[in-house]
């Protein structure tokens, strides 16, 4: 089963057959299946939409799988959000976009996911207000985890029952952006723009997302889309599970150098 899940190509026939097989044997497969899917999401992140679609199809037939998967994702997020190495921080971002996709296929409550994204940006704003030494790199990273997940479900969420929460997330991000310093680390500047000015990676990301929001065009070629057939079938929240509160741990960073080393700035919005 593990190899079949790993090599699932996302085609309608393969997803339909695999999800039926998994649902039929869920009484004995649940824990293993959840573990396999979580492993695939973190190790093969480019196929995240494929695994989200698979999870949605299995959940529609065996809701206990969806409940266990959401709980596993929440626990993994709490662990990685406080991770001290690059691998854990990457997984936090990957798991966040997986949750966003799960919300579009009826596995997890959409409002719960929007609340989680909002809590990341709120935590960033709280750090900015605190003014503790070295606050900005971690605050930027928390907001980055939330905002960089939006292209993976922005088109759906912006038109869903969570449209207001979606807009509020942008408002919160704008409020945070006004509290942060532009390019606080001179050594982390990216290439100068054509007019010779420095481009701040966080503001660049916000500008790109703002353009997608204004144009209503969230399609990104590098993100494989979930088949429209499945999106229509799975968009209902009838079997969606509560995410619960995701704890965002505080850190013990006490200086700018340590913070910048642990949470380096990004040069562009990366989605893959």
Can you name each region flagged by the protein language model?
Residues 3-4, 36-44, 76-88, 120-136, ...:
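Helix-loop junctions that connect tandem helical modules in alpha-solenoid scaffolds
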Residues 93, 101-215:
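Extended alpha-helical scaffolding segments
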Residues 1-50, 63, 67, 71, ...:
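Long, low-complexity, highly charged intrinsically disordered regions
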Residues 13, 28-36, 53, 64-75, ...:
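Short sequence/structural elements of tandem HEAT/ARM alpha-solenoid repeats
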Residues 6-15, 45-53, 89-99, 142-147:
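HEAT-repeat alpha-solenoid elements in large eukaryotic scaffold proteins
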Residues 8, 23-27, 44, 59, ...:
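Amphipathic alpha-helical protein-protein interaction segments
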């Amino acid at each position: 089963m593990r190899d079949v899940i790993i090599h699932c190509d996302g085609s309608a026939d393969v997803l339909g057959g695999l999800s039926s097989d998994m649902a039929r044997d869920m009484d004995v497969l649940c824990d293993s299946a959840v573990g396999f899917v979580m492993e695939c999401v973190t190790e093969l992140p480019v196929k995240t939409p494929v695994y989200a679609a698979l999870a949605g199809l299995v959940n529609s037939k065996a809701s206990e799988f969806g409940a266990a998967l959401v709980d596993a994702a929440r626990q993994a997020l709490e662990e990685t959000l406080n991770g001290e190495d690059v691998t854990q921080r990457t997984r936090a971002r990957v798991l966040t976009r997986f949750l966003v996709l799960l919300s579009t296929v009826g596995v997890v409550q959409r409002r719960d996911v929007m609340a989680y994204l909002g809590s990341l940006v709120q935590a960033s704003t709280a750090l900015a207000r605190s003014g503790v030494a070295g606050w900005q790199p971690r605050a930027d990273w928390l907001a980055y985890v939330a905002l960089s997940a939006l292209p993976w479900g922005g088109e759906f969420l912006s038109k869903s029952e969570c449209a207001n929460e979606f807009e509020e997330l942008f408002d919160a991000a704008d409020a945070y952006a006004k509290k942060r310093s532009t390019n606080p680390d001179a050594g982390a500047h990216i290439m100068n723009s054509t007019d010779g000015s420095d481009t701040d990676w966080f503001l660049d990301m916000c500008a790109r997302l703002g353009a997608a929001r204004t144009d209503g065009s969230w399609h990104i070629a590098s993100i494989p889309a979930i088949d429209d057939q499945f999106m229509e079938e799975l968009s209902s929240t009838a079997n969606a599970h509560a995410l619960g509160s995701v704890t965002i741990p505080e850190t013990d960073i006490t200086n700018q150098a340590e913070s910048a080393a642990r949470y380096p700035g990004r040069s562009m919005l990366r989605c893959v």
